[in-house]
Amino acid sequence: MALRLVTHFDVLEDVLPSLLTQAATTDEGDRAGVLETTYGSLRVLNIERNGNIIYTYKDNKGNAVFGLYDCQTRQNEHLYTFEKDMQAVSCSVNSERTVLAASFIQYTTEGVKNDLQPGSKCLTLLVEIHPVNNVKVLKAVDSCVWVQFLYPQAESHLLPQNHLLLISEEKYIERFHIQITREDGDRVVIRNSSHLPRDRLAEDFVWAQWDLSEQRLYYIELKESRSILKCIQFRADESFNLMFEMPLDITLTGLRFKLVNFGYDYRQDREKLCNQPSLCIFTNHTGSLCMCYSPKSDSREEITYSVFYLHKGYRKIFTAAPGSADSQVTNGADSQVTDGIAFLNLGYFVAVYSPGHFLHLLNIQHPDLVCHSLFLTGNNKIAAVLPPSPLQSLPGSLVLDCYSGKVYRVTLDQSYLLRFLWNAHLDCERMAALHCILSCSQDPGFPEEQIIQWISEHVSACHSFDLIQEFLIASSYWSVYAELDDMGMLLQYSSVLTWNTEIPGIKFTTEELPLPLMKVYGLKGYWAKLNSNLEYIKYTKPHLHYHNSVVRREWHNLISEERTGKRRSTMYVRNILENAMKVIASMETRTLEPRLIPFLQEEDRHQRLLMGLMVSELRDHLLRHLQGVEKKKIEQMVLDYISKLLDLIWCLLETSWRKHSMHPLVLHLNSHCSAADFEVFHLMTRILDAASSLCLPLPPGFHSLHTILGVHCLPLYSLLHYIDNGVLLLTETAVTRLMKDLDNSEKNEQLKFSIIVRLPPLIGQKVCRLWDHPMSSNIISRNHVARLLKNYRKEPRNSMIDKSSFPVEFLPLNYFIEILMGLESSNQALYGFEGHDNVDAEFVEEAALKHTTMLLGL
């Protein structure tokens, strides 16, 4: 199962034993009778902002009893006993646990609301419970009423008065102001309880949802056949604001009146519950705002639902084939209730769940491409974990099972997703599963090593996208994402820009939406982030995502200038190289264990330049758009991001290296090629291709190892083809190793010569003298002569040559050597260069004679 459920609260385990113990101490009758009565009536009524759970049950006298489970102390507390056999509909207690509000409704013995009995059907009470004292009747009406106390921002911040929301089935919402005083020490009394001030917050609404964590009220009004979504934010200073309103282009067919997160009425007519469409709103700390909607449908062939990404300005309408249902889930007495679908908030994802049919994990943080969401059908055995009964999503990734009274903490099951990743056959499945797992990178037990192993073994498995690119970009993104919420707008999330491949079992369409109209200015917290997202959608073209195009251009310019002898400002280049040193220092601290592959041990100036340029450009990019963030923090995030990227490349290679049990001796060219060598070489080639197309840096030493493995694995013509096309770079380290390790057999001579003639001049001059061979002397001589004659102008000279000063009488050679000696004596600086102090006209003459002798076979 892609979801993992951990029981956070179980009313039968956390409450029932305490109630039985209490009954035994008070001698309330036989234990079996108490157990039967309590067990049959015990249920969860409400969950408050601080996580405390309010429950109700019937005692052995049939009285309605309210209790509270403290999630911090894990203790139960009796709140109030209503000495009458009525069914509790709703209950809430203030943060000080001194005042309780509850609503009751009369039922017949069959458990159905009695609409024929005269008198008020619903009674709403306000009770002083510290100690139990006065009871105030708030409402006595024929329609249902729900109650909810507002909570301050912190438990220690006690308000001078309490505020109670009252939601009526007659489609209005009121807020009561309850002034509390203390008399005779700790005795709590409601002041002026007969005339409680109230505000009318909403009228003519058909749907409302309470966000208990953030103290927000969402509701939908019907105006002239239009559905208007609104939101009220209640603040710690007792004020409230209408934050936004937005027209919804949906027909709420069958939605007469529905509440979300105001408790759950277990005695509602099941057919009525089943015929209601599903609608709920989810937010998270990054400023996302999603509305999920599923109309009631009688179709058994397909299920349709919509997700309104209000923070993105569009909605997606999904149509899914139900898949093969699990008979254990769909059969039974509760089958009618499970016909609909449930939406569960998992933070960065929303789970869309149809019991026994499908589970969709929708990426709400980056919903643009459907390939970043995972779509599982009944064939994936998804029905094994989530219960078939109605589920109510709560903040903090909590879910209430409305029938069993259990509260679960729901997270993505990393083990399942990893197994799914190994067994997936479609690119869309691999992409989605990879992103689901990487979103858990900050969780304990994150299986990064197993993911890297899968990547290293499946580099060629995906055809719709480059797997290595996707892994590097997404993993580096998630490594720093938690530090700043705005990273989603500034850093690249995926290497894939478009996705046109169909996903089996799912169809979708995308429709643009008008953006929510914000009603408040000077926003803070979540609302500031939501507003920032909306401003980004309205005004940002193109997107602000960082890319390396500027770095690529500047890097190529620096390399070109070095080759042509031009130089930038010394301070500019020094700053770039210092940036690279900081990244390397950050990489070295990522692990204390010795590495198998000896990266970071050579200069590799080009990679250090690229590294330093990326640090500079990414830092400037973030500083431009994160002006309220400390510069030092941004600099550290940049170093973490780039060092993580380089470390992932290193880990990919080490995983493959370890898998094939390769020995460090592979770095010596006198050993023979093996299948393991070729596997690692192929992986390095794919990494190089992925990094080059994105202009990402590689660990210093990467190119040397890649070239050494290339010499091991490739025939000469293929090797030279790779070199000529820039796949293999001839670094000084790799060529030096080649000259030292290979003997002068005919095959190796051909290889060495082919390598030397392709070397840049500066490296070639250093490497040639390491090869004790006439061919090397010939190349050194040619380079020396070319330097001397570069600016040579022929001048009249004595045609007579002193033949006695030459070992061989060969006039063309003698004449040429004399010219060289004259040039050498006139300007020493022309031919002196590092490592070749002994190269002069004499050396050239000797090399020419040896080469001629060899050609003539003498």
From Swiss-Prot:
GO terms for cellular component: trans-Golgi network. Its main location: Golgi. Keywords: Golgi apparatus. Interacts with APP; specifically interacts with the CTF-alpha product of APP. Interacts with the gamma-secretase complex. GO terms for biological process: positive regulation of amyloid-beta formation; regulation of proteolysis. It is found in: Golgi apparatus, trans-Golgi network. InterPro entries: GSAP_C_dom, GSAP_fam. Belongs to the GSAP family. It comes from the Eukaryota. This is Gamma-secretase-activating protein. The protein is first synthesized as a holoprotein form of 98 kDa and rapidly processed into the gamma-secretase-activating protein 16 kDa C-terminal form, which constitutes the predominant form.
